[in-house]
Design a protein with these regions (language model features):
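Nucleic-acid endonuclease domains
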Residues: 1-65, 69-182
Length: 182
């Protein structure tokens, strides 16, 4: 059923989603949902529906837990080069060690050509070439002491480099293997 009648009006579910999420690129929370979807699809671990209050964003078939963070916004501060950072404050208890931490974290950044492109940004958001990501183990991230934000500089200090989203699965598998080898 895609139409419902309420208050004497015929409402369309698709129209609501178009209105609410028409530009997924405006807010990190919206782009975060898309990032979760893309990562889950790439890793073949999408649950039937998204659970907002689940302990972890995604759980792979082998039980590996993932936390997904995404941003489209570069921060600009006087005297600094533009940089990306991700808000992890809602996971601060996890990062402080007060509750189990996700096995791996995937930090994604998306950049969409704005005025130069005739392709709508919502369509660009589904194009893998517009995404890069960092993959880091939860334990390595916990040692960094971040409880509010994680920046690119933090990830690089931890020895993590960005990769195209298309290479994420390969990098995650290598990280998982090196974790098993320790």
């Amino acid at each position: 059923m895609t139409h419902i009648t309420t208050l004497g009006k015929l409402l369309n579910v698709l129209s609501f989603y178009r209105w609410a999420f028409g530009d997924l690129t405006e807010q990190d929370s919206d782009i975060g949902m898309l990032a979760e979807y893309l990562v889950g699809d790439i890793l073949n671990c999408l649950p039937p529906t998204r659970k907002v209050n689940a302990p972890f964003d995604l759980i792979m078939k082998d039980g590996t837990s993932l936390e997904i963070k995404a941003t489209t916004h570069q921060r600009v501060e006087k005297g600094r080069n533009p940089y990306y950072r991700w808000d992890v404050s809602t996971q601060s208890e996890m990062l402080k060690g007060n509750r189990p931490i996700a096995d791996y974290w995937v930090f994604l950044m998306a950049s969409f050509p704005r005025e130069a492109s005739r392709t709508p940004r919502v369509v660009q958001a589904f194009d893998p070439k517009n995404w890069k990501c960092y993959v880091v183990s939860g334990e390595k991230l916990r040692t960094a002491g971040c409880t509010m934000y994680v920046s690119e500089a933090t990830l690089r200090r931890l020895g993590v480099e960005p990769v195209p989203i298309a290479a994420m699965k390969k990098v995650l598998n290598a990280e998982m293997q090196s974790g098993r080898d320790r």
